[in-house]
């Protein structure tokens, strides 16, 4: 299926916060309670619609372990959006957000859209981080914020789509040079060509996560 734009996302955060589960819920609409630790980087893709235009999201799910941090850093380059995830039941995952954000700011393009997600809101009875704290962190650092549940699917769709809508608005506002793929945006059919007038006319073929 052809797309007007392709947006590249990266999902970052500590091990065990539910990054892979969020991706699986978004791409396959299912929850896998037992998930192997991500080794390096996993990949998923899905078509959505923004402003009546087909947008393909290409999503890189990264490992949270410190030993894979250098691999993760290489994926910041060329990402239009990032989902920064913590677990509302584990305080330390919230405390580590500043370190993840510093990495993202250092290695990504300055206009990358970052969505902060407090995952596992279905476990509110075990909450260790208040919603207000998440909101405050997002406000201080210029992030979008949502609490979500990869298990119940609450706000999962909304988080991915709101991030895409923000990126799309930046394109409309001329923030991105869409002819420069280092911004994590690729122009397909019906998208606004870059200043050079060039347009990537490729279409995505096949199904599954690699389509």
Curated annotation (Swiss-Prot):
Main location: membrane
GO biological process assignments: endoplasmic reticulum to Golgi vesicle-mediated transport; protein transport
Intrachain S-S bonds: none
Keyword Nucleotide-binding appears in the UniProt entry: yes
Motif (Effector region): 35-43
CDD domains, alphabetized: Rab2
Protein name: Ras-related protein RABB1c
Organism: Arabidopsis thaliana (Mouse-ear cress)
């Amino acid at each position: 299926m052809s797309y007007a734009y392709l947006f590249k996302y990266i999902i970052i955060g500590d091990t065990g916060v539910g990054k892979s589960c969020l991706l699986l819920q978004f791409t396959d609409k299912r929850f896998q309670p037992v998930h192997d630790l991500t080794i390096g980087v996993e990949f998923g893709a899905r078509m959505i619609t923004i402003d009546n235009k087909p947008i393909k999201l290409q999503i890189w799910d990264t490992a949270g372990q410190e030993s894979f941090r250098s691999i993760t850093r290489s994926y910041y380059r060329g990402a239009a959006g990032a989902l920064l995830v913590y677990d509302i039941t584990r305080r330390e995952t919230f405390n580590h957000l500043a370190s993840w954000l510093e990495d993202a700011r250092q290695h990504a393009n300055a206009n990358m859209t970052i969505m902060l997600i407090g995952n596992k809101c279905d476990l509110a009875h075990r909450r260790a981080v208040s919603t207000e704290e998440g909101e405050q962190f997002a406000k201080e650092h210029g992030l979008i914020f949502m609490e979500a549940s990869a298990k119940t699917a609450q706000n999962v769709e909304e988080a991915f789509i709101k991030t895409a809508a923000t990126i799309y608005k930046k394109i409309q506002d001329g923030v991105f040079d869409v002819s420069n793929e280092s911004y994590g945006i690729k122009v397909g059919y019906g998208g606004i060509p870059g200043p050079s007038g060039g347009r990537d006319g490729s279409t995505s073929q096949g199904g599954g996560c690699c389509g």
